[in-house]
């Protein structure tokens, strides 16, 4: 099957792992099945189309018949929101489909490369012999000040007041998967609700071809993290508080794998993951530390954005708040036609803050996208500088590193073959900021189980600290999050 695909980027700007970077080529270790996954060129159309119908009745009645008459095959359809994914349509068929009174928008997917990373540093091994800790304030890297993000956001004050989240609150991590066997995450992931929508893609004649759901090592679940990113994000939301403290450590995590070991995915895969999380997985919170910058005026993009908007609005109607990363391209989203998706369609879009040389923890991160029309709040994402000696690892965000990390430069995280050593990575990006907000949402939801999505959003926005220009500003909008205040004002 030809895959009509956009490749989403995970939104990490810097990894402190030996000489690792988010854009490193994928190693043939531990298996060589992915070796051509990065050979699909940016911008190449791959044969799949998203069709957005004017109403939900159109798709289930005449819509499917029309597509078949034009020579297309409906690969996936969501009648409740009027969206279908189609393969096999010619250029003339696309024109005819767009002209139909049944159809609102039609768009060809296309390949996009992930956003590049820049800075690197060193990995750290966790101390051996430590056990899960009920008190996140006792986690090694919180106690020594490395997890500064938990302090500035008021998480540590919330812990001291007894707010740790509850098992009944469920957070879906839409990402590269989760290393559910890492000591920080063991027992926290609901395996029965976890799933993978990530596919392995190879290039054949300049066209992306879907070879099926990304395979795993023997014994691993389909949602195992073969990268590192999803595990890092997940352990920021919740952890066993051994070396790193989780923001809301007692909540339940759901691994929804939508990005492959290349760190990229498709609009269809991400949208399918959202529907799974909000539907059968029954998530209260969705974290998406991923995204793509697209030109709203480019042909077909409107269909992709409208599809994503409908999927997210449907999730919100089911009671799920969707929190996404703004991106790391230093783009002013108030200007021009660039759209950061899915952030700008999400309930809350998150920019990043962080210190340089451990000074001014609330300054704007050098890489973050911004814009008052797009961003809702900011959170600690870590900071980097192009100047030699302009930042230290401690300016970044530390969290767990997957034992299946795929890049050759990340293989230090695979060193614990006997389970004796677990590794942690420093990283910076809006990817790292977003799970702080997801953790805040989970903590508020745990304390207020009946709170609505609107009430949850308002509590997060209106409790944020004004850390930039007085009033709402283009970099943080409502401010940098403060969960201790949010818990006081939440309805």
Put a short name on every predicted segment.
Residues 1-20:
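Sec-dependent bacterial lipoprotein signal peptides
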Residues 16-45:
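Bacterial Sec-dependent N-terminal signal peptides
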Residues 135-251, 272, 279-285, 290-295, ...:
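Active-site core segment of subtilase-fold serine proteases
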Residues 50-59:
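Short, surface-exposed ligand-recognition loops at beta-strand->loop->(often short) alpha-helix junctions
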Residues 25-26, 165-167, 240, 258-346, ...:
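Substrate-binding/access-modulating region of protease and related hydrolase catalytic domains
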Residues 64-146:
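Autoinhibitory propeptides
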Residues 50-51, 85, 170-174, 235, ...:
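Structural recognition of the beta-strand scaffold that forms the well-ordered cores
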Residues 342-443, 486-488:
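Extracellular S/T/G-rich loop segment that most often corresponds to the catalytic His/Ser-adjacent loop
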């Amino acid at each position: 099957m030809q895959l009509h695909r956009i490749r989403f980027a995970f939104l990490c700007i810097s990894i402190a792992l030996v000489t690792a970077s988010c854009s490193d080529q994928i190693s043939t270790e531990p298996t060589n099945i992915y070796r051509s996954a990065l050979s699909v060129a940016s911008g190449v159309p791959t044969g799949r189309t998203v069709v957005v119908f004017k109403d939900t009745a159109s798709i289930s009645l005449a819509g499917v018949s029309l597509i078949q008459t034009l020579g297309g095959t409906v690969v996936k359809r969501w009648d409740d929101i009027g969206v279908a994914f189609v393969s096999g349509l010619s250029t003339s068929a696309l024109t005819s489909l767009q002209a139909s009174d049944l159809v609102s928008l039609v768009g060809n997917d296309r390949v996009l490369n992930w956003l590049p990373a820049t800075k690197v540093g060193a990995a750290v091994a966790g101390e051996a012999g430590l056990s899960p800790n009920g008190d996140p304030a006792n986690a090694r890297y919180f106690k020594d000040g490395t997890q500064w993000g938990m302090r500035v956001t008021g998480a540590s004050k919330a812990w001291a007041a007894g707010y740790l989240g509850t098992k009944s609150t469920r957070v879906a991590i839409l990402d590269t998967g989760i290393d559910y066997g890492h000591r920080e995450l063991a027992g926290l992931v609901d395996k029965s609700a976890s799933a993978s929508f990530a596919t392995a893609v190879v290039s054949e004649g300049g066209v992306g071809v879907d070879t099926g759901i990304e395979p795993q090592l023997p014994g691993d679940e389909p949602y195992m993290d073969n990268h590192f990113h999803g595990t890092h994000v997940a352990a920021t939301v919740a952890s066993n508080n051994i070396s790193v403290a989780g923001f809301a450590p007692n909540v339940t995590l759901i691994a929804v794998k939508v990005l492959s070991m290349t760190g990229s995915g498709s609009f269809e895969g991400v949208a399918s993951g959202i529907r799974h999380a909000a539907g059968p997985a029954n998530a209260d919170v969705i974290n998406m530390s991923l995204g793509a910058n697209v030109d709203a005026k480019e042909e077909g993009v409107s269909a992709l954005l409208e599809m994503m908007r409908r999927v997210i609005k449907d999730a919100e109607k089911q009671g799920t708040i969707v929190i996404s990363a703004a991106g790391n391209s230093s783009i002013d989203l108030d200007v021009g036609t660039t759209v950061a998706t899915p952030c700008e369609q999400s309930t809350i879009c998150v920019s990043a803050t962080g210190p340089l040389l451990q000074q001014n923890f609330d300054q704007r991160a050098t890489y973050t996208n911004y814009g008052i029309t797009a961003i809702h709040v900011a959170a600690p994402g870590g900071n980097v500088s192009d100047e030699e000696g302009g930042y230290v690892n401690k300016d970044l965000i530390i969290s767990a590193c997957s034992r299946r990390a795929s890049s050759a430069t990340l293989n230090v995280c695979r060193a614990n073959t006997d389970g004796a050593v677990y590794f942690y990575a420093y990283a910076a990006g809006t990817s790292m900021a977003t799970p702080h907000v997801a953790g805040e949402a989970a903590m508020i939801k745990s304390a207020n189980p009946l709170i609505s999505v609107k009430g949850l959003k308002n509590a997060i926005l209106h409790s944020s600290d004004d850390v930039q220009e007085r009033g709402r500003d283009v970099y943080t909008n409502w401010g940098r999050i403060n969960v201790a205040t949010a818990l006081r004002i939440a309805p």
